Amino acid sequence: QEEMFRAVDEVAEVVDIKALLGNAPTELSGGQKQRVSMAGVLVDDVDILLFDEPLANLDPATGKRAIDLIDRICRERDKTVIIIEHRLEDALYRDVDRIVVIGDGRVVADMTPDELLASDILIQEGIREPLYVTALKHAGCQVAAKDHPQHIETMNLEPYQEKVRDWFEKVSLPEIQ
């Protein structure tokens, strides 16, 4: 029993829920419940962690913190992490090695985020691609994997500037009254 309490205390520290250990589940917010679930996954020291819809029912800010936490756990504990998630843009907030897209029960794609975002697979499968990728495509740009579209902050946008500028000048915006 002492070992169990030690393990709970340790993972509660990792996911920042130590102050909540005395609370009933009904007293916890959605984000706190997600962190409790993550703690449950961490209790057993396994090499591969599977998170099934870790962003479900979380607002975007809390979802971002959840992805930060998963990323931190992955780095600090040297774990392989598998995330099953429909909110792709939120999951891509941190670095991802590979994305597997499943459609109609079969693997449709298994590639790097850069390769996937440069393709039309997400659209074909009814998955919303990141908004900046959609905007570039609306501007007539052919997004290339070599420009690293996984993160807008680090993407090479130089090849797209002229087309985006031309598109912006052609788009008529409604008058603000």
Each language-model region and where it sits:
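Conserved ABC ATPase "signature" region
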Residues: E3-L20
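Conserved ABC ATPase signature
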Residues: A24-L28, Q32
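Hydrophobic anchor residue at the start of the ABC signature
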Residues: M38, I84
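Catalytic Walker B motif of ABC-type/P-loop ATPase nucleotide-binding domains
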Residues: L49-D52
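Helix N-cap at the start of a conserved alpha-helix in ABC-type nucleotide-binding domains
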Residues: P60-T62
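Conserved H-loop
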Residues: R87-R94
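Conserved beta-strand-loop-alpha-helix hinge in the C-terminal portion
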Residues: R106-Y132
